[in-house]
Amino acid sequence: MTDIKPYRHKYDGAYCTVDTFRHLLTGNEARAHLDQMAEILKKGAIYVLGLHLLPASGITSSVVRWKNARGRLNVHTTMTVLDIDRKRRKETLSVSLRVHSGNSKHKIRSVYKLRTYTLRQLRSLIRRTGRFDILSTYDNLYDLNRPITPDNSTEDIILLLRKTS
């Protein structure tokens, strides 16, 4: 995400959703990613950036669960916030998958370090790049007919960015 090679042609759009951006653990890595994305996009191109924000009052839930099934395949997912260090801007997240398919059962657990962003910190980062304007913002339902006005309580945000230079 920080070693994007230039291509022969520039692109009209790109996306980075589902919180992937927060795997960039330093401000320098985040800035490098945005700068490199700007290099491969045409002027006026769209970049969709989606991530989880840290609200001023803290997160509303430290555990999120969901399950999905298709035929004989069942997947149960549990995401648990293990720690948030506001000073260092680090979150420790555990993701557990329980997979059942017929007689087969698997359990997978991963622990990730993620960078935290408040709304102010995210806006500041984008402004400092000088390469993108925020066109509109959405929640994680991605409904283009329902833009949101984020505030300090916003937890999930999708930014529709336009490359300016």
Predicted region positions:
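C-terminal lobe and adjacent flexible extensions of AdoMet/dcAdoMet transferase-like proteins
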Residues: 113-165
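Adenine-nucleotide cofactor-binding loop residues
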Residues: 2
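A short His-aromatic
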Residues: 22-24
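A short acidic, Gly/Pro-enriched loop at the edge of an enzyme's catalytic core
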Residues: 5-14
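A short glycine-rich, Lys/Arg-flanked "PGG" loop and its adjoining helix->strand segment in the class I
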Residues: 29-46
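SAM-dependent methyltransferase
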Residues: 48-124
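Short aromatic-enriched loop/helix-cap "lid" or pocket-rim segments at secondary-structure transitions
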Residues: 10-11, 59-63, 148-149
